[in-house]
Amino acid sequence: NFQPIYRSVCRLAGKGDKRIGMIGGLPRLSSTKERIAAYQEAVADCGLPQDDLLIRYGNSMENSAQSCLDELLEQKCDALVVAQGLMASETVIYLHKKGLKLGEDIDLVTFVDYDSDINYLYSNQMDCIIQPVEKLGETAGELILQRIETPDAPAFEQVLTSTYQPCGM
């Protein structure tokens, strides 16, 4: 979660983007906290303005990104990082309806599933952070079964890696 967001924000800054907005998921989730921390660290390291108005939170459900997008576009963002797949789809549709062209009028980085339609259709116009969703589901199922079989076993953490894919790659 951390490294792909950090790299993507630094890449946007390197392209000349100055006001990079961030839409995170639910603030209480560890993945959201980690992604926001990566965004904030990258913004600071790249010498960009640190402005809380550039960070918004959706609820990771359908129709939760639109109000965030309205607010971020009012802040004159020239790039957006959307840290959740469903909100990413909504963002692409919203920007299209507003007449904004990805990669020209606004830069976009989104979390997507490897086989998502958004990744397939727009990977040449936006940066993608590809999540191994099948492996996430498989691993979660295995951990649940292990917990049922051995409820007193010590807890452990398994980290699966997302892949950062700059546009056109």
Report the location of each language-model feature:
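Hydrophobic alpha-helical segments within soluble ligand-binding/sensing domains
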Residues: 1-22, 37, 62-69, 88, ...
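Flexible loop/turn connectors
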Residues: 71-169
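Short beta-strand elements in bilobed, periplasmic/extracellular small-molecule ligand-binding domains
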Residues: 40-63
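Short acidic capping loops at alpha-helix termini that bridge into adjacent secondary structure
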Residues: 19, 50-54, 102-108
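An alpha-beta-alpha
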Residues: 7-47, 152, 156-169
